[in-house]
A protein has these predicted regions:
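Small-residue-rich helix-loop
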Residues: 148-248
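Active-site cores that bind ATP or allylic diphosphates and position pyrophosphate for catalysis
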Residues: 1-57, 62-69, 77, 102
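Charged substrate- and nucleic-acid-binding regions of tRNA-handling and nucleotidyl-transfer enzymes
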Residues: 235-295
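Structural motif
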Residues: 81-89, 125-131, 165-173, 246-254, ...
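Short helix-capping/linker segments at secondary-structure and domain boundaries
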Residues: 23, 99-104, 144-148, 185, ...
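Short alpha-helical scaffolding segments that buttress acidic/His motifs in well-ordered protein cores
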Residues: 95, 138-139, 174-181, 256-263, ...
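Residue-level signal for inorganic ion chemistry
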Residues: 20, 41, 66, 91, ...
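A conserved active-site cap/scaffold subdomain adjacent to cofactor or substrate pockets
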Residues: 73, 77-162
């Protein structure tokens, strides 16, 4: 076995074994592509009079199409995960699931739970397929389990990087979208209409509202009713909405969608009650008036 090159440098196998022995490594877990190297390493360890670590060779991680994963493929660069807003615990959770069977229906684990459950015996023999969408789903589950303060703190840098303001009630704003986002990088787009008054309207949503002949008069009546409420709360606003619909001989549902689009510019998002509370009376009335102008222009 050649251990030293003609230029005096040592080959990988020699350096690898020396490193493991010096650091008293007890377990070496590596890809199955290193399987052919193990006999050489065992020979070197024996020659050094050292104690061999326990070797385990696990299946390679493949792309969805079955090709070998390379550093240029999606999900291969570790630095991409924090930039996209993956939580460290979620990434560890997902990587553990790639090629390992927990023997249960559970898929979401904390690092401590993984330490308690993981065993090499549970690693599958067949190569695993890497699924970045599954990783995002795991991240969503971990976000949902976070407390509000921790989520707001984690999301804040992404919102600031997007050039959006951070209002005093940002923690409450973050809480309203906590179960709506998969990645922290999605938070800015989810909260932009809550932290600033200039935002884009979804074209399809606006077209749908325009198709409702009662939308403009109903929204105008609602703005007038909101402006004279004795006190402002989501419940009071919803009661006013029901009264306006009843007075106009319409169903409450006919007003809910136009109201959401008027306040947020989009067809989906946080709970309408959260939007009403977070925006407050003045901003809600202003947005209703602005949207009725858009519908009639």
């Amino acid at each position: 076995m050649v251990v030293k090159r003609s230029d005096g440098s040592y080959v990988f196998h020699f350096v690898n074994v020396v490193d493991d022995l010096e650091m008293e490594i007890t377990h070496v877990i590596r890809g199955e592509d290193h399987l052919m190297n193990t006999p050489k390493h065992l020979q070197l360890i024996e020659a050094f009079g050292g104690k061999a670590p326990q070797y385990a060779h696990i299946p390679l991680i493949l792309n969805q199409d079955g090709s070998k994963m390379s550093k240029r493929d999606a999900g291969a660069a570790v630095g991409d995960y924090p930039r996209q807003g993956f939580l460290p615990d979620a990434v560890v959770n997902f990587i553990a699931l790639v090629g390992w069977n927990s023997k249960t229906d559970d898929e979401i684990f904390t690092p401590q739970e993984l330490i308690q459950r993981f065993s090499l015996e549970g690693v599958n023999r067949a190569p695993a397929r890497f699924d970045i969408e599954k990783c995002a789903w795991v991240n969503l589950q971990h976000i949902a389990k976070m407390d509000t303060a921790s989520f707001a703190a984690a999301a804040k840098p992404f919102v600031e990087q997007a050039g959006l303001p951070i209002p005093e009630n940002f923690e409450a704003i973050a809480a309203s979208v906590k179960e709506k986002v998969r990645l922290l990088q999605e938070v800015p787009a989810a909260v932009d209409f809550l932290v600033k008054d200039e935002f884009a309207y979804d074209d399809e949503a606006v077209t749908k509202v325009k198709g409702n002949a009662q939308a403009v008069p109903l929204l105008a009546m609602l703005a007038a009713t909101f402006s004279v409420l004795s006190e402002w709360s989501a419940d009071a606003a919803k009661n006013a909405l029901a009264e306006v619909a009843k007075e106009a001989g319409a169903k409450t549902g006919q007003l809910m969608f136009p109201l959401r689009v008027a306040l947020s510019g989009r067809p989906h998002g946080p709970d309408l009650a959260d939007i009403l509370n977070l925006l407050g009376r003045e901003r809600c009335v202003a947005r209703l008036n602005r949207f009725t102008e858009i519908l009639t222009s």
